[in-house]
């Protein structure tokens, strides 16, 4: 009985607190738990201690989840397999995809790739092109594709998410980043199947993102490769296997990576192929051999080449619009790629690549690289190089598309087709072979394909392809693969030596690019099959180069072999025109490798280009083994070997740079690039880029790319990269070499690659990126990818036409070397620029001087106005570089602003360099010449507050005027909050300086937009003469978290002063609390601001400013009509609401609140004179005041004595308006204001707004308040105490028992700020009373009045029927409101509560 009593009494209390009317039912034996559940279900959930009847998520807990037949509503809630509610909102496809993604994650990198591929695959499906289905297959390969596939649809919708999530899951951070990218890509995937294919690529790239992911991506690509051919796929599958292994470990990756590399190349290719596969259709063509395609392409490759490209192009055509958009997207998407964006772009790339088919392939490559990029920035760097390669390829591929007919040729190439494959190399090979054969112009196209060979990176897949080309080629590929795998291993290196990776990535690029180059080597092999093998060896060596330069050396001998291929290149040289094309052709795959070689091959085309290319050779160096070989061959096969040595290691390269010198004057040029190349080594990836350069136009791009890669590697690299920028000059040449078309394509390539580098800048650059310069701009995009890259990228920006101008600023002496005199002067500027912005400035003058050249070249910049845009970007980039990557954050802005400034380009270059501020309206040098010239500086920064989600943007605009003593500075603060409200604060500081002093006037203009209504407040801030004085100008609300976790606000005073320099200084003065005891014994806390000032005699003056917390709630009880006498004596009727409130003494007070006036009154007053006859008959003149009042059409005139005229204009209320008002707790309420119209001295109307009181709707509890109810029950066995906490937050009352909420209700009463304890004691058999301060105690059974500390009328009239066992202490309004439960049962609460207790004890 004791337990039962305790239990029931406690529940009686609970029910009483809840205000339940079911006490009788409970006390007389009804199901108590059901009754409680019915009453409290709206407040109770299982996790808050609900009854045992609500478990398992059945319809008793969540009736909204079941229809009237009890069937689950799957669209409303989430159910498990037993139709139990998991949570009362729909299961999200993303969650299931996440589950699949978890599966993916378990599958790990493969899954990841697959999931991406899934996306792609479904999308693949979408793109029939998908033939991709191979990809799907591949995705299957990648993952247990089946699951992925099944999930893939979801994945597709969520696939971006899934891809990302799964990838994210598997490769964690990298993947996550990549996953977002994947998401981007998947969206893009959504954008197009091709995108899908690219997304698979992206996925692939995501895999790459994994890093092994790259392998994984390769595995995706493997998917592609499966498309390539069963055997390719076999490789692919190996890749797949390896890729997981790769995921497992990079070493395996190495081994597998070789396959993977092949496959990854394929991946690249395949992804590119995939892209092409979207192109697949190309791919399909690829499928046809997909990679085999490569081979097939070799055989069918014509199809593949041509058709893939062609098909892809047709598909491209279909996709091409997408592609086109995507291609711009490719640029932009690449940009989008940024990284994720890269991924996205990669998808788009896919699309775009598809558009190009191969270009998109390039894109895919980019995608691939981007995924790698996703995988890791270093890899990204590397991947970006690869991407660059691929992007070159993209260019090429697009060109390939153009060349695709050539591709047809290439199919002819088909033998080289496989070269094609490698070219994608294949295309270049093809182009090379057949294109070249067909026509050097085609060769030019093919040089694009050389870009393709960049694709060779992809082509490395193509290398796989090339293996397809021939088993031995494949062997080469394998070698390449090997190197690439090493690269993969180095990819860790890449990560660690991402510069290497960059290099290696170059090598990755290398290998991939090397792969590319290898592919290209393959291409080279294509140049000669054995050569290719050599090339592959080179590839191997190049990765080995990554591994060790000595191998590079050895490989360089191989390179020599390849140099024989180089010889081919040389031969290409013979066909130098073709070299341009043909060199690209030449090994154009090599050219790819060469391409880096290409440059050299192209270089071969023209030694000057070679020189330029030699930079690229440096770049090639990176390709070093092969590309350099190419380069070397071009330089000289052995020289290039030297170059390779350089490639072998940047330090060696440095050493070798001397070799480079020896390598030949060209090499010398390259040697500067060698310097570059040493940097290149760091930037070697850039070298990779160079290889992209290889596609010479790409070379341009790639140079840029190179620059960017190098830039990525290091700013010094940037310098070196600028040499590549030089390459970009070469680009000029190379573009010349290739053919401007290639250049165009290469630009795209650049853009893609750069896109790879970094989408954001790429984005900006992307538009330009398509421009050849843009490519470089793309490089800058890469710069965007990473701030270091950005720095480099700025050089890239330089690289872009910018290369000429900015790159000159930014670029670097290397460029100068390569650039030649233009670059030199500018390069000095640029190198110095690199060294320091000031130098850049000075140099910028030089740059300007060079800009004459720059100008000339800048004309180039301008001529390549895309480049100019680039140069703008350069500017922006440089500003970014100079300012720091900060600005790069908003690379888009930069691009735009930069582009804006780009018109200024040359001066802006210096300006930017001189100052990161975006606006160099004039070159700083020209400003001093005009004393009265005005320079406006505008800087912008955005700060996002993590805690409350508001982002605040500060824009500072300063306009100093020389030779004038007045300066105006304006700072605009824009705060955007999650509730869609926007607050703009404008601080205007006017400093007027005379000969001796400066006076500052400050005014803050605060504008708040709430729900479409605008409130403007002018807050003048007085000038504080004494610095020691603290004057609280205004108060502010500071959010504070109490120790118990409650969030409240504290009022602080803001003291605003001006220091000796005339700058505004604000200081926060916390307001102290003063405790005071009220008459009823309650202690209140009053916040007051303590203001300390210094008096006239130096004494300290302390002033306390009390701050009232309390808000009264006013309700209009009724409306009446009141007569009102105006200042002019006229009496009018107004409508007013009568508000009845209770003051602190408990007395009722009435107060009228004006509502709406019935008429509009206009008035004026003036003086008049008229004659007056005095009593003595004399006539004089008297002056009187006349007040004229107009009401509607009526006019009233009143004459008063002059002394009775109002001293100020009469104020007449025109109307009452309700305006929004934001309370300190961020609640938005309304405020009633009167609009007053006054007449000034000139009888002009003046409008004034004044608040007229509190609106009837306003209720604002100052703080979250909570009270404690201590409930004690006693019986023979002793006493037990229960504590119930009542928390009041806003107008929500939450009652908790033992920490769990049992009642939550809304109250319309204003809840005052206080905290009280209420004690209840119940003793059986006798009466006990607990005295508490301020309480009224009565032991008689008569009614006990409950008196509250506040005298609230809600409680005054109520009474408690007290049994002999109950005593009620003082109850505050908030506590009483809680105890009374909801409004429906408040009147009967006390009765139920007492009766319930009595009955409970009777039953007990």
From Swiss-Prot:
Induction: Induced during chlamydospore formation and filamentous growth. Expression is regulated by the NRG1 and TUP1 transcription factors. GO terms for cellular component: plasma membrane; side of membrane. Its main location: membrane. Glycans are attached at residues 817, 994, 1074. The PGA55 mRNA is transported by SHE3 to bud in yeast cells, as well as to the hyphal tips during filamentous growth. Predicted GPI-anchored adhesin-like protein which may be involved in filamentous growth and chlamydospore formation. This is Probable GPI-anchored adhesin-like protein PGA55. It comes from Candida albicans (strain SC5314 / ATCC MYA-2876) (Yeast). The gene is PGA55.
């Amino acid at each position: 009985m004791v337990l039962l009593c305790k239990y029931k009494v406690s529940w009686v209390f609970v029910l009483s607190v809840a205000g339940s009317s079911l006490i009788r039912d409970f006390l007389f034996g009804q199901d108590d738990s059901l009754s409680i559940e019915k009453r409290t279900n709206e407040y109770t959930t299982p996790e808050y201690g609900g009854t045992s009847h609500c478990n398992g998520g059945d319809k008793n807990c969540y009736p909204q989840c079941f229809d009237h037949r009890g069937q689950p509503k799957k669209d409303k809630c989430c159910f498990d397999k037993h139709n139990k509610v998991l949570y009362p909102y729909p299961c999200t496809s993303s969650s299931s995809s996440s589950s699949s993604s978890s599966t993916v994650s378990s599958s790990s990198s493969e899954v990841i790739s697959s999931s991406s591929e899934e996306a792609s695959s479904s999308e693949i499906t979408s793109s029939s092109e998908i033939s991709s289905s191979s990809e799907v297959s591949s995705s299957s390969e990648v993952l247990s594709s089946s699951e992925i596939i099944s999930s893939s649809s979801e994945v597709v919708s969520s696939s971006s998410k899934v891809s990302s999530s799964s990838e994210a899951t598997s490769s964690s951070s990298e993947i996550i980043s990549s996953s977002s990218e994947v998401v981007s890509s998947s969206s893009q995937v959504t954008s197009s199947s091709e995108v899908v294919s690219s997304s698979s690529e992206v996925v692939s790239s995501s895999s790459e993102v994994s890093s092994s992911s790259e392998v994984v991506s390769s595995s995706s690509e493997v998917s592609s490769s499966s498309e390539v051919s069963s055997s390719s796929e076999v490789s692919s599958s190996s890749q797949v296997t390896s890729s997981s292994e790769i995921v497992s470990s990079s070493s395996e990756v190495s081994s597998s990576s070789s396959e993977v590399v092949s496959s990854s190349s394929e991946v690249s290719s395949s992804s590119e192929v995939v892209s092409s596969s979207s192109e697949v259709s190309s791919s399909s063509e690829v499928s046809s051999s997909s990679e085999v395609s490569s081979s097939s392409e070799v055989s069918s490759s014509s199809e593949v080449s041509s058709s893939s490209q062609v098909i892809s192009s047709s598909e491209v055509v279909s996709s091409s619009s997408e592609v086109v958009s995507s291609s711009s997207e490719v640029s932009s998407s690449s940009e989008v790629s940024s990284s994720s964006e890269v991924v996205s772009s990669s998808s788009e790339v896919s699309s775009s690549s598809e558009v190009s088919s191969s270009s998109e392939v390039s894109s895919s490559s980019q995608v691939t690289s981007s995924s790698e990029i996703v995988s890791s920035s270093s890899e990204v760097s590397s991947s970006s190089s690869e991407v660059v390669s691929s992007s070159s390829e993209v260019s090429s591929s697009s060109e390939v598309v153009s060349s695709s007919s050539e591709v047809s040729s290439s199919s002819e190439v088909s033998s080289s087709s496989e070269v094609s494959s490698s070219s994608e190399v294949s295309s270049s090979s093809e182009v090379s072979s057949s294109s070249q054969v067909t026509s050097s112009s085609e060769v030019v196209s093919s040089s694009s394909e050389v870009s393709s060979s960049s694709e060779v990176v992809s082509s490395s897949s193509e290398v796989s392809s090339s293996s397809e080309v021939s088993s031995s080629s494949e062997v080469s590929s394998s070698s390449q693969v090997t190197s690439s795998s090493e690269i993969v291993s180095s990819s860790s290196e890449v990560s660690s030596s991402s510069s290497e990776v960059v290099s290696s990535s170059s090598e990755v690029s290398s290998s991939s690019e090397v792969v590319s180059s290898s592919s290209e080597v393959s291409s080279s092999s294509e140049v000669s099959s054995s050569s290719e093998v050599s090339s592959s060896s080179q590839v191997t060596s190049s990765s080995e180069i990554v591994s060790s330069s000595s191998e590079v050396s050895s490989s360089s001998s191989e390179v020599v072999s390849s140099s024989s291929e180089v010889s081919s290149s040389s031969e290409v040289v013979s066909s130098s025109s073709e070299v341009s094309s043909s060199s690209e052709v030449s090994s154009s795959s090599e050219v790819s490798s060469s391409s880096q070689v290409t440059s050299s091959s192209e270089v071969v085309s023209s030694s000057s280009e070679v020189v330029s290319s030699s930079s690229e050779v440096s770049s090639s160096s990176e390709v070093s083994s092969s590309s350099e070989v190419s380069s070397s061959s071009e330089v000289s096969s052995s020289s290039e070997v030297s170059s390779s040595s350089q490639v072998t290691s940047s330090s060696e390269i440095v050493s070798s740079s001397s070799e480079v010198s020896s390598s030949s004057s060209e090499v010398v040029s390259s040697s500067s690039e060698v310097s570059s190349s040493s940097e290149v080594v760091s930037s070697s990836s850039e070298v990779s880029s160079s290889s992209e350069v290889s596609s010479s136009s790409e070379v341009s791009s790639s140079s840029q790319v190179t620059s960017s890669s190098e830039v990525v590697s290091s700013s010094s690299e940037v310098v070196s990269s600028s040499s590549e920028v030089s390459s970009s000059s070469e680009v000029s040449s190379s573009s010349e070499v290739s053919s401007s078309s290639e250049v165009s394509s290469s630009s795209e390539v650049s853009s893609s690659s750069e896109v790879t580098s970094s989408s954001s800048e790429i984005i900006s650059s992307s538009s330009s990126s398509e421009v050849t310069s843009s490519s470089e701009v793309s490089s800058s995009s890469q710069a965007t990818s990473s701030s270091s890259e950005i720095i480099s990228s700025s050089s890239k920006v330089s690289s872009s036409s910018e290369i000429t101008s900015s790159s000159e600023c930014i670029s670097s002496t290397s460029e100068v070397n390569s650039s030649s005199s233009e670059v030199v002067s500018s390069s000095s500027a640029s190198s110095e620029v690199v060294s320091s912005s000031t130098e850049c400035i000075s140099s910028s003058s030089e740059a300007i001087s060079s800009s004459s050249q720059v100008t000339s070249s800048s004309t180039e910049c301008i001529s390549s106005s895309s480049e100019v845009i680039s140069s703008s970007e350069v500017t922006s980039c440089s500003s970014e570089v100079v300012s720091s990557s900060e600005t790069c954050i908003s690379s888009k802005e930069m691009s735009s602003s930069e582009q804006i400034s780009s018109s200024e380009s040359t001066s802006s270059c210096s300006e930017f360099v001189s100052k990161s501020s975006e606006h160099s309206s004039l070159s700083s040098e020209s400003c001093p010449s005009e004393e009265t010239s005005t320079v406006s500086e505008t800087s912008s920064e955005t700060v996002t507050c993590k805690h409350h989600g508001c982002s605040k943007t500060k824009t500072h605009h300063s306009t100093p005027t020389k030779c004038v003593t007045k300066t105006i500075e304006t700072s605009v603060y824009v705060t955007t909050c999650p509730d869609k409200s926007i607050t703009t604060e404008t601080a205007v500081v006017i400093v007027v300086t005379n000969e001796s002093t400066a006076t500052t006037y400050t005014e803050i203009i605060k504008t708040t937009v709430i729900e479409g209504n605008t409130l403007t407040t002018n807050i003048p801030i007085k000038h504080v003469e004494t610095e020691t004085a603290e004057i609280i100008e205004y108060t502010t609300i500071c959010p504070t978290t109490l120790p118990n976790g409650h969030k409240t606000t504290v009022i602080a005073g803001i003291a605003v002063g001006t220091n000796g320099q005339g700058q505004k200084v604000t200081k926060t003065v916390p307001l102290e609390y003063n405790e005071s005891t009220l008459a009823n014994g309650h202690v209140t806390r009053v916040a007051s601001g303590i203001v300390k000032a210094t008096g006239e005699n130096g004494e300290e003056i302390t002033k306390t400013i009390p701050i009232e917390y309390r808000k009264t709630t006013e309700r209009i009880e009724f409306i009446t009509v009141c007569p009102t006498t105006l200042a002019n004596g006229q009496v009018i009727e107004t409508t007013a609401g009568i508000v009845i409130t209770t003051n602190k003494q408990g007395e009722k007070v009435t107060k009228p609140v004006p509502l709406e006036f019935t008429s509009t009154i206009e008035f004026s007053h003036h003086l008049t004179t008229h004659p007056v006859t005095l009593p003595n008959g004399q006539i004089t003149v008297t002056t009187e005041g006349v007040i004229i009042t107009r009401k509607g059409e009526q006019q009233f005139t009143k004459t008063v004595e002059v002394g009775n005229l109002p001293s100020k204009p009469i104020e007449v209320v025109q109307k009452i308006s309700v305006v929004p008002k934001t309370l300190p707790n961020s609640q938005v309420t309304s405020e009633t204001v009167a609009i007053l119209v006054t007449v000034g001295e000139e009888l002009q109307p003046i409008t004034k707004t004044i608040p007229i009181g509190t609106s009837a709707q306003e209720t604002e509890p100052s703080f979250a308040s909570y009270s404690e109810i201590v409930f004690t029950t006693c019986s023979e066995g002793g006493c037990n105490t229960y504590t119930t906490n009542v928390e009041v937050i806003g107008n929500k009352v939450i009652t908790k028992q033992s920490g769990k909420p049992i009642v939550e209700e809304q109250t319309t009463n204003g809840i005052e700020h206080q905290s009280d304890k209420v004690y209840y004691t119940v003793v059986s058999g006798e009466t006990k009373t607990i005295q508490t301060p301020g309480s009224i105690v009565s032991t008689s059974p008569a009614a006990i009045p409950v008196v509250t500390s506040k005298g609230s009328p809600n409680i005054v009239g109520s009474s408690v029927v007290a049994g002999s066992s109950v005593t009620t202490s003082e109850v505050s309004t908030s506590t009483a409101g809680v105890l009374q439960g909801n409004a429906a049962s408040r009147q009967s609460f006390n009765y139920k509560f007492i009766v319930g207790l009595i009955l409970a004890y009777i039953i007990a």
